[in-house]
Structure formats: structure tokens, C-alpha cells
Amino acid sequence: MSTPTDPAAMPHPGPSPGPGPSPGPILGPSPGPGPSPGSVHSMMGPSPGPPSVSHPLSTMGSADFPQEGMHQLHKPMDGIHDKGIVEDVHCGSMKGTSMRPPHPGMGPPQSPMDQHSQGYMSPHPSPLGAPEHVSSPTPPQMPPSQPGALIPGDPQAMNQPNRGPSPFSPVQLHQLRAQILAYKMLARGQPLPETLQLAVQGKRTLPGMQQQQQQQQQQQQQQQQQQQQQQQQQQPQQPQQQAQAQPQQQQQQQQQPALVSYNRPSGPGQELLLSGQSAPQKLSAPAPSGRPSPAPQAAVQPTATAVPGPSVQQPAPGQPSPVLQLQQKQSRISPIQKPQGLDPVEILQEREYRLQARIAHRIQELESLPGSLPPDLRTKATVELKALRLLNFQRQLRQEVVACMRRDTTLETALNSKAYKRSKRQTLREARMTEKLEKQQKIEQERKRRQKHQEYLNSILQHAKDFKEYHRSVAGKIQKLSKAVATWHANTEREQKKETERIEKERMRRLMAEDEEGYRKLIDQKKDRRLAYLLQQTDEYVANLTNLVWEHKQAQAAKEKKKRRRRKKKAEENAEGGEPALGPDGEPIDESSQMSDLPVKVTHTETGKVLFGPEAPKASQLDAWLEMNPGYEVAPRSDSEESESDYEEEDEEEESSRQETEEKILLDPNSEEVSEKDAKQIIETAKQDVDDEYSMQYSARGSQSYYTVAHAISERVEKQSALLINGTLKHYQLQGLEWMVSLYNNNLNGILADEMGLGKTIQTIALITYLMEHKRLNGPYLIIVPLSTLSNWTYEFDKWAPSVVKISYKGTPAMRRSLVPQLRSGKFNVLLTTYEYIIKDKHILAKIRWKYMIVDEGHRMKNHHCKLTQVLNTHYVAPRRILLTGTPLQNKLPELWALLNFLLPTIFKSCSTFEQWFNAPFAMTGERVDLNEEETILIIRRLHKVLRPFLLRRLKKEVESQLPEKVEYVIKCDMSALQKILYRHMQAKGILLTDGSEKDKKGKGGAKTLMNTIMQLRKICNHPYMFQHIEESFAEHLGYSNGVINGAELYRASGKFELLDRILPKLRATNHRVLLFCQMTSLMTIMEDYFAFRNFLYLRLDGTTKSEDRAALLKKFNEPGSQYFIFLLSTRAGGLGLNLQAADTVVIFDSDWNPHQDLQAQDRAHRIGQQNEVRVLRLCTVNSVEEKILAAAKYKLNVDQKVIQAGMFDQKSSSHERRAFLQAILEHEEENEEEDEVPDDETLNQMIARREEEFDLFMRMDMDRRREDARNPKRKPRLMEEDELPSWIIKDDAEVERLTCEEEEEKIFGRGSRQRRDVDYSDALTEKQWLRAIEDGNLEEMEEEVRLKKRKRRRNVDKDPVKEDVEKAKKRRGRPPAEKLSPNPPKLTKQMNAIIDTVINYKDSSGRQLSEVFIQLPSRKDLPEYYELIRKPVDFKKIKERIRNHKYRSLGDLEKDVMLLCHNAQTFNLEGSQIYEDSIVLQSVFKSARQKIAKEEESEEESNEEEEEDDEEESESEAKSVKVKIKLNKKEEKGRDTGKGKKRPNRGKAKPVVSDFDSDEEQEENEQSEASGTDNE
């Protein structure tokens, strides 16, 4: 047996290695890391167990429950120590529980083999050699402890023997317990009782302490008795036990503050508390026993042999107190020493030997295994062999580890403190405490489990969150990348677009700057086929025109040469024969003619001196002058010879001009050699190059530009002709004269298109006088003018050129016939006539070969197929022609072509080519949208290039800066109540309400259907009294006797008249004179009544005014101090060619469809010579058809601006100015700056006032007018209101519908009397017959004869059936005409209209009309996707139109279309939308309306059947009562029936339907039957 001094057997203090695997060697076949079951070193602490197998009390205290419970309880205590919460208030009780010895129910201790196999340390001492391995000096039979040294609740002290007196007295122990209890209560925060305070101070013991002392004394006495008995039995062992008792007692005193356990004695409130803060780690796990290692065999053998006799092992610490008492009793009863059992050391050694033998045998078996084993078995065998070979190494390693641990341990109890703990009695309170702690532990475990689960769920949620965040970040990155890519593409596209725009701007810049080469290069770079095609066609067309112009000039020159030769030959023959000179018509010149007063050029035969002009003799005095001046003779050159020389010298001039051009190119402007004349030429050339965009330099081939070819011969005109007197031409008029002279020199014709008022008449007279003086072209000149301007032309000729002989060809046929001899004699220069007489008297006027034909207001020739153009082209010979017009392009480009074709038919041949080239940007069918700005400019410039040589146009603002400004205002006018009602009915139904007098229903009201609705609407806007029956009915209503309304009711019925009533008095007060233009003569009559009511002096000029009276009217109005305030003119008759510059205010009462008519009318006042600012007031009714007319007029003016004005054919505008003007038109063409507001008095005054003083005066006049109206007791509003209207005009919609149906019924089925006869408005006579009838004076008789012949011829044709079959066999080519449907019965139409009106007018509870969006569909342009989805679009407007055109034959057809409309809405719109729901409601409304009408029909049919039955019964009764029958022949019956039918037409029977398909034969048959019927009567 090893002593405590032996270092190998001495227990060393140190940390417990815990319940880990045993460090002993592996003694089994398994080479794994688990503990060996037979290892001596497998336990680190003492293993308590039975001292002997045969001991009767060895199994006492065993119970059937596992020992892991205590280890599980120790585990959380370790966590408490680790977390540092030992100082917690509730920690003490848990510590006590953890340090308590095992419960009796913890079960029996396991065997050493099981302990080794499980791999954890047991807290009990080993049964294999208790005397050797347990280092307790107390013998097994001794009492557990001495009474003096016993501390209640101390498990170690209970197992200690009594080694002498205790160091503490009982009083000190009582005071110590009281102090511990007080400390515990203070730690819990509880108050200390007085008894406890006295006990702490040692003044008094706690109650129950005395009983405890007595028990302790009894226990001490018992222990002394036991010690005496043991001393007698075991005296040799006593010194050793005493030697060990002292260190153990000291160890107990050292470990006493570290124990946390308490015992509850029988006394109340007594507790023993020991603080465990000093060594928590050592108490938290079982400590090893510190048993010496069995490795050194020398130490083991003495230990085994030193045990004398049987030894009794002390009871396990977990045994309860009854077991101890029983053990004490047995030791007292049987003190005999028990026999010694088997030596466990030898058994252990034998077991070791056998295990080693088995291991060696197994190693040999594994080494001798064959090599042909499968791989898996071989692997297992190899692993097992290597494990067995490692056994000794593992054993050595474990010994070294244990040796090291033994050195670190000083006290045996430090390794396993629980081995010496005294077993304590378990009280009920401790059991409850244990149960409570167990519940807390379970709750804590559940909390931890839930917390762990919550953490798990949180980790899942966090993972999901991270997952989402990750993918969101990935998606964000992808989105950013996509955005970056899209941005890159957008930037690239933007840059490309900018580059494209830059190239387009550069191209436009070069196009505008006339850099043709650069422009073509850019076109080639872009490879725009469309622009290249336009350029190519432009070049081809212009080149073609250039060739045509050149050919035309050559042809004219050749003709002129032939004529000159012929004339020269005749002149020579006449000179030889002494015949008088011939006139322009080939006849000899009469002395009384104008030609006799012209100077004749003569030359001196010797000197060659030529006399011409005033110095030359006149033609009438030529012979006498030659006799008086010998040596002179008539110069051989006549006017024809002069023109011949011009044409012969044309080529020479061209060559010289080319040489001059070359010289100009060689000249250096900066050199000193350049003369002043050359410098001027250079400047002029530069100006021309800048101004004329078409004058190009000669190309390499020397060809000239289009304009240069056209105006090859140029002549400078610096002053007007001497024949032009009483005035001087302005500079721009001289330029116009020069341009016309250039046309004459180049054998071309043109259009003088100066704006109205710039003096086209004066320039024409100047051209005639210039040609007469300088070109010897005395005429005859044919000037064709409108009838309204004929007197003005005569006046201007008398004023400017009185020496020119003129004939005004007009008047009655007798007057015109009286002028024929003068025409034939040629004793005149100019013939003035009108368009009508040119056509009527062409057999007279066309015989004269006119030198010049001048057509004023040339836009009359705009229609190529009009009669005037055809007559002039076919009958009249005039090689030189000029058109005068202020509006060269009024509506369409073909009109412009018609003018050019009339002037130059050889150049402008095909209208289709011209229109195809230039009509694209102006077509109203959408072609204009397809052209971009550049293509539009190209096409317009191409048209300008074509027009420039033949058209000259200047505007007033350009040529006459002194001309006062012209300001135009569009004034919106309101309607009166009468106008509004009439307008609404006319617009919606096409009817005009009447009082019913035309149908003998006077006062009940009626309706009158009128054709040409737009014209009727314009009449209503102007004045409702333009309808005579309305005026008569209102006259009767207002009490006027003669059926004509006068006075204030005239202006109260019309909004425009009311506006005039406010404006005209102000203009008269400020001495402004007014031109008032109207479209309708009946309106002018109403206007005259109004002027008479207001006492305005006026003049009237319209189409009925005679030509003689017109000049007198103009003279009256224009004379200074004229008393006439207003000139009332019709737009068509008085808007052309009149000079009315005395007026400074123009009122356009109603606009014309052609805006140029209104412009012409405005320029009657805004002319050269006007001194005042001109105000143009255009009246327009709000929300009426007049606004549409104004919009159409604006579009036409837009076309004119693009073509004519942007060309700026004024010969001096630069290309930059023309480009800027055209660009401004294109940019602002869609702006609309009008408002629909009716202006108030202040706004009106601002419009018509020229100065501030006038504005103030007008405001005062308005104030006075309002005051006067307020003073009038019978005052009425300025415009008529609804309460003033008669009852027959205020009808509800149902009544108006009824009247409309009646009117339609009469219109379709007739009045029932007879069929309407056709009226032939065509001319019955041919022109020859008409002229002959005029001459004979029997015009009416001739017309009647022709009509009778036509009627007979038609009857003969009707009787011929063969012709009828031939006509039927003939078919028109192309698509057959659309058949007109036969009309429906009025009742069905009425029902359909009633149903549709019910559906359309249906409103919901909120008052919203559901059918508003269904009335008219949006256009394809606004909503293209609707028409892609819906195959058959339909709306209520189309349905009503089909009802009107009788497309529906039954209500079922109507229902199909309405259902289709609703179905379309439901297909296109989403389910649940408002339109979708409205369509469902409208379906139900339609069905209910149809059912209602069906019920009404059934009730009507039933009532009709009842009436018919009653009629049949009456007729039967009448037939029975009649006894006498009168027989008549069939003719009499037929005649009587016809007479009855005429007297009382039967509306119940079917009436003949008049349709467009009735042939003429059927109509005549009906007429004949009617005629025979009337004859029989």
C-alpha cells in the first residue's frame, strides 16, 4: 500500500479532467478511441460501491433510475459559473442542489466495465481495492464522524472520524449559523428579526439550538463508544488514521466556505448557508479521487498485502440516514471481523494477461491473412491491425498524461470532493424545491428550445431576406446595366439624329442659297431617291420648257420674217404704183383715221439724215412735205422692218453680250483701268446675280438658263411714252412697263399679277402708248374687261391717253351694229368690250386680226373648258396676249395652268403633267402630309422657276411705302332667338317652320323643306326676313299691315344688323365713309329699308345696275364733299376694278367662298391714292356655317401664299427674302388665333377707332345710347328673345318631327294631283338662230317653235320600240351607277326615328347622356387601333343617315345595326368600364322602346279592325236599302271617278311614286293619261 508521502500515490490538487474518456489503454479488440473496459487508469476519482459482494447492506440505497440526471444538473451550473452570474440572488439554492449527494432513487452504481465502456467518470470510489485506493485513514467499521467535529449539512464532515476536540465551540457554531442566515436574508433584501440580530451578536441563541446541541452530545457519546470498540479491534491502524485525520480536518476547514449545501433541521427557520464563490469551478464537476496509478507493479503488490482481514467500506454518500442507523446497529450487534474476499488485483492482472494474449493472437491472424481478399475486407483488416499495434503507444501516452495530472493535484478531495460528502436526509421542502427547480429547468429548456427555434426561424427569414436582397441587387444591377445600354443606344441614336438633322439643315441651307452643286452632292451622300428623283424631274422639266420656249421664239421669229417679207414686197409694189399706204387690216389709210396723224420716218438721199418723231411729217401731209423738201424720201424701214432688224440682230446681240460677259469676267474691279461705266455695269451685274436666283453663269457648253433664254432681248425703259399725259408713272410702274416690253420683244406672253390697287390699268395704257410710239404698233388692241369696270377703263383712257382712239363696244344690238363700219375701216387703236360680247359678237370681232389681246380680271380664264377660253382660242387671232389679275391662283393649280395654257399653248400643253408635277403639296386629300418641308420647298421652287419668266407680281407693302396700313378684323356676331330656332331646325332637319298658311292651316304651324341647306343657313345668319313667308307672318304677328317690317324690328331680328346699328352711327359721326359688300341682292333690299329707317344716305350697285349708271355712281361717291355715307355693293359686281378710295372703311357683311373676291372688294378702298388708314370689318356669326366658309377661304389663301407670294415675282426680291417668307408660311400655316367670343362695345370701339379721341367719343355714344334705352318705357332688348316669338315657331322636338314627316311624305309621294313636269333650262336656240332672232326681233316666237319641234320629236321617239330596245341594250362603261332605294312608308321611318331618338336622348339618374360617345366614332387618324380590331364600325350618326336614305326595310334591320354598335363597344372596351356598361344599358333601352312601339301597333291594328268591321256592317245595310240601280257607260264612270279623285284626293290609297328611275316614256304616258282624264271631264 502506498503511503501519502509516495509521490506516485500522492493525490495532487488540480482541475478535474471531467467526464471525458479514460486515459487508460485500449484493451479490447476494437481499436477505436473509446475507453477500455479493463483499464486500471480509466477512472480519475474514487468509485463508491459495495465493499464486498456478500455484504448484506451493499445493495441498500439502490434505485432504478439513471445517473445521468445529476450530470445534466451539473451542466447548467457550469454554464452559470462561466457566465459569471454566481452572485445572483437565486443562484444559492441551485448551487446547493448541484452539490447535494445523489438521491436514493438514482439507482445502483455501474460496474467498472460498464463505466469504462460508457466513457465517463463515476463520482463514487472503486470497489476494487478499497483499502488501497481510498486514501481515507478511517477504518471501515468506525463511526462516520465525531460529534464535536460535525457540521450539519457538511457531507464530508459526516464521513470524517472524530480526531479530537473541534476548533469551534457550540456557541461559536450557533453564532456562525446565525451570521450565515443573516447574510442570506440580507442578500435577499429581507429584514432581520430581533432574535436573529441578537444571535448574530452572540447574546442569545436561536430557538431550537438547544435540542440540536443535545442531539449532538448524544451522537458524540455514541461515536466515542464506537471508537473505543474499534480501537480494541484495530489498534495497529490507529496511528495512521490519526495522522490522516488532522490534514483531512484542515482540508474540511479550508473547503467549508466553498460548499453550497444546506440542511433543514427540525427547528423552524434554521438554515445553514455556505458561500460557494471561492471555488465554483471545482464544485461544478466531480473531482477525481487521486488514486495512484497501477502502472508501477512494486507499489501495487504491497498495497494488496497490507490489508489485514475484511474491511468494511463506508456507505455511499447518496444513502439515506436510516441506512446509517441500521449499519450502526449491525456493527454493534456483530462486531466480528468479516472474512476477506478475493483479491481484485489478481483478478485484474489475470484479466490483463488474457486480453494481451488475445490481442497477440489476433495480430498474428491479421498478419497471416491472404492477399486475395476483397478490397473492403482488406481495408477493414488493415485498419484493425494498425489499431492493435498502436495499443502500447496509447497506454504509454495515457500514463504520461495521468502522471502529469497527478503532479498538478495536491489534495485528493480537490479531484473528487463529492466522495467525502455526507449523505443528507431529504426533506419535503427540498423535494418541493427540487421539483420547482426541475420545473424551472424545464421552462428554461422550453424557453431555450423556443429561443433556438425562433433563432432558426429568424435565420430562415433573414436568409429569405438576404436571398431577396441579393436577387434584388442582382436585378438592380441588371436594370442599371440595361438602362446604361439603353442610354448608350439613345445617346448614339440622338447623336445620329443630330448628325442627320445637321446634314438636312446643311442641305436646306444650300438649297436656299442656290448652291446647286453642293446640294446635289449632299443628295448623293444621303442617297435619298425621292429628292434625287425630284431634282432629276425638275431638271428634265425645266430643260424641256427651255427648249419649248426657244422653239416658240424661233417659230414666232420665222413667222414674223415671212410677214415682213410679204409686207415689204407689197410696200414696194404700192410705192411703184403710187397707191396709198395700207392700214393694219390691209386697207389703204384714210386721212380721217388715226393712222394719218402718226409721223412717218423720212431720210435724205444724199446725206442719209433720218427724220423721225415730231420732226418727221405726218402721214396725211407726207406728199405735200416731200414736194416742199426735195431730196427726202420715205425711209424704207417700217415698223415691221424695224422688228425684222431686231430679230436679225438678235444673234449678233447674243454674241456681243457673250463677249461682253467674257470681258466682264476678265475685268478686275480693283484695278485702276476700270472705268466708271464698267464699274456701274459690274454693280448692276452683281445686283442681277443676287436678285435673280435663276440667272446662272454660262456652262461649259455655253447654254443659258431658263429665265435668260426667255428674256434674251432686254430693253431699258427709262421714261413713259409722250402719248401718256396727265400723270407720271411711278418707278415700279415703269418696271412693269419694261417687263411687258421685254415680253413683246421676246415674242412671249405673260401675266401682270400686281396686287389690287397698284395700277394695272395705267401700266396697260402705258404699254399701248409705248408700243404705238416706239414700236410703231398702232393696233388694233383688244381689251376684254368685266362690265362693271368698262366705264372705269374708258375714264382712265380719257384721262391718261386721250390721243388714243378707242371704241367702247357695248349696249344694245343696234348700238353695237352701228360700230361695225368703224371696226372694218380700222380707224381705231383700242377696242374695249366685255366677256359677254366677245362670245355673242364673235362673228364680228373675230374677223379683225388683233395685234394684242389684253384680258382684265384674267382669273376669269381659270377654267380651261369655259366658253370664254374656248371662243378666244378657236375664233380670235391674237399672237400677243397679256392677262391682268390681282389673284393669279385662286383655288387650284389647274386654274393657273389654264391661264398659262391660254397665254402660251405651245409651251404649256398638258394639264395632267402640270398638275402631276405641282399639285402634290396642295391636294386636300392628305398628300400634303406625306411631303416633308424640304420636298415642299423643292416643288414650290420648281413651280416658281417655271412661272418667273411669265409672271410679274408686286405687293402694295413692297412698292408703296406711303400707302396707309390696312387692318382687318373678324367680328363675331350673336344670333337672335328667331335666328337660333330657324338655324337649329334647318341644320338638323333641313326644314323651315312656317305658320301653316301655305297649307290652309294658318296659325297651326307647318314646315317647308328647302334645298341647298348651306345657302339657307347663310340666309338665316344674314337675316331671317330673307324668307318672305317668315317676314309676312311676323308682320302680321307684330301688327304691320302691308306684310313688310320696318323700324327697330329690322335690326332686332338679326345679330349682324344689330352690330351695324352700333357701328354705323359712330362712323358717320367721325366722317368715315363705308363700303358695305353683300353676297345677296335680297339682303341689300332689307339693308335699304334699314338705311331709310336710320336716315343714312347711300348708293347701291349690284349686277342689275346698268353700265351707264355705274360711272355716275362712282363719280357721285368719289367727288369731294359727297353727302353719301355708305356705298352698298354686291361682292361679285362691285368688287372688281372700281376705284372707291374716298371710303376708308370696308364692311364685308358675308364672306365669299372664294377669298380673292373679298380681297378684291377690300382693295376698292385700299388703293394708290388712299390717304387714311383702312379698316376692314368682316362679320361672322358665332358657331355657324360662316365659320366653315372662313376656314375654307383661309386654306385657299394658304395655297396662294405658297405658290405666288413666296415666289415674289417682282424682279428685285433676293433669294434670301423669298426663302424667309416661304419658311414663315410653312411654320405658321396651322396657327389659329380666332376666338368664339362676341366682342363687347369697348372691344368694338377699339377695332373701329383710329385715334384716342375717336375711342372716347365712341364710348360716350354707347353710354348715351344705353341711357336713352333705359328712359324708354317700351324698351325691348337689342336682340329678339323667345318670349316675343309666335306660338307656331316655338315647337317641341316631337312636333317638329311630325311636321318633317308630313313634309317628307308630300315630297316623296306628291300632293296627289298630278306628276311634276320636267323643266328644260337649256338654250332652245343655237347662237346663229339667236343672233338672227335678235336682228329680226322675233326671239320669243323662234324659241316657241323650237320647243314644239322638240316635243314632237320626243313623242315620235317614244313610239319607236326599236330605239327603246337599242337604248336598253347600251350600257355605260365602267362601274354601274348606284341604285337608289325605293322609299319606306312614312310610318316605318317615323317609328325608326322615334326609337333611335329614345336611345340617343336616354339619360341616367345623374342626368348624363349615355349615347354621347356613341353618336360619332373618332376618325381613323385619331384612333387607328379601333378600326384594326372592329371590322364593321357603326355609330348613331351613320344609323340615322341610313334611316334617312331608306336603307332599313324593317325594325329588325335597324336592331341589327344597333346591336352591332353595342357589341363593337363591348369588344373594344374592357369589361366593367363605363362605355361597356353604357352599351349594355342602351341595348336594353332599345329593346324596351321597340316593344313599346310594337304594343302601340297592335293596339292600333285592333282599333282599325274594329272600325273596318263597323264600316262593312254599314255598307251591307246601305246595300239592302238601295233598290234602284243606275247603269252608266264605262267612260262616264271613268270621268266621274277622275273628277271625284281630283276634288277630294284619297290619301288612303297608294299613290304613284316619283323616283329617278322613271323613264321619260313613263312620265309622258302618265302625262297623257292625265291629259285624257282632264279632257274627258
From Swiss-Prot:
Region listing for Disordered, in residue ranges: 1-77, 93-170, 205-340, 556-597, 632-677, 1351-1388, 1493-1577
Short name of one Pfam family: SNF2-rel_dom
Catalytic reaction list: ATP + H2O = ADP + phosphate + H(+)
HSA domain span: 441-513
One GO CC term, this protein: brahma complex
InterPro entries: BRK_domain (IPR006576), BRK_sf (IPR037259), Bromodomain (IPR001487), Bromodomain-like_sf (IPR036427), Bromodomain_CS (IPR018359), Gln-Leu-Gln_QLQ (IPR014978), Helicase_ATP-bd (IPR014001), Helicase_C-like (IPR001650)
Residue stretches of biased makeup (Basic and acidic residues): 656-666, 1357-1368, 1529-1540
Residues the record lists as Phosphoserine modifications: S166, S169, S321, S334, S593, S596, S671, S675, S1382, S1499, S1503, S1515, S1555, S1559
Composition bias, Acidic residues: 641-655, 1497-1516, 1557-1568
Entry protein name: SWI/SNF-related matrix-associated actin-dependent regulator of chromatin subfamily A member 2
Organism of derivation: Mus musculus (Mouse)
